[in-house]
Amino acid sequence: MSFASTSPSPWLAAVLAIAGAAALAPAHAHQVWLENAGGQARLHFGEFNENLREASPGRLDQFKGVPALEQRTGTAAQRVEGQLGKDGFHYTVAGTPDTLFAAASYPLIDRSKRNLPALYWQPSARWVSGLTQAVAPTAPLDLVPTGKPGEFKVVFKGAPLPKAKVQLAAPSGWTREAETAEDGTVGFATPWKGQYVAEVKHSDKTPGEAQGEKYGEASYVTTLTFVLADGMASPDLPAPPKAH
């Protein structure tokens, strides 16, 4: 597979304006992502690259309860319960996990006014301690590091997902997009130090049932958060959007 250019200049050309469109976007246009530092993990809801974090009271309350966090260290897995905070779901993490994962539960989305079946929206988030170690996928739609520099893999229901569009947001919020190869892998240059958040989306038109209700289509969005200690100093994230 071919990797994205190692030159940071394409990133600089990809600066996104943070217009008020984010405030008008439906909830399922958002993402959830994990941050972890000092034994305290946070699951945020919004848009990392726009520095938008939904709050409680507010759109954060639309989820069906507090998602459980799965903590994995080596082959050991542990379930961690959390609490709803003002800016996200909060968790206390023990030790030094290799990866954290959370899948949030959102009510089925009624699309009957458009003569469409109900939509099952599944936002999920993964955090990894580094990119040098491969992580096994566990979610229906998962995005994991392969252990090779700058390489990631997208898996859907246990199989590599080719031609999936993966967006990587740098610590500044600047984004690049690349498509997975036939084996589900994709590569990015990561020239800056700091926190990155990658995202992949996938739609499945297979009908199913969730939360005791039937749906006609499923929409998955999964993020992967990692922090790099080495690299160039990065500009800051943009100022948060005005309250909405």
Language model features with spans:
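Bacterial N-terminal signal peptides that target proteins for export
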Residues: 2-15
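N-terminal signal peptide c-region/cleavage motif recognized by signal peptidases
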Residues: 24-26
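Beta-strand-rich domain onsets/edges
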Residues: 29-40, 113-150, 212-244
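Beta-strand-rich structural segments
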Residues: 39-52, 144-156
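N-terminal, post-signal-peptide region of Sec/Tat-exported proteins
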Residues: 49-90
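Short amphipathic beta-strand segments in non-cytosolic proteins
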Residues: 67-76, 164-179
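Glycine-centered loop-to-beta-strand initiation motif
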Residues: 85-91, 180-194
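Short, aromatic- and glycine-rich surface loops/edge beta-strands on solvent-exposed regions
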Residues: 92-114, 195-204
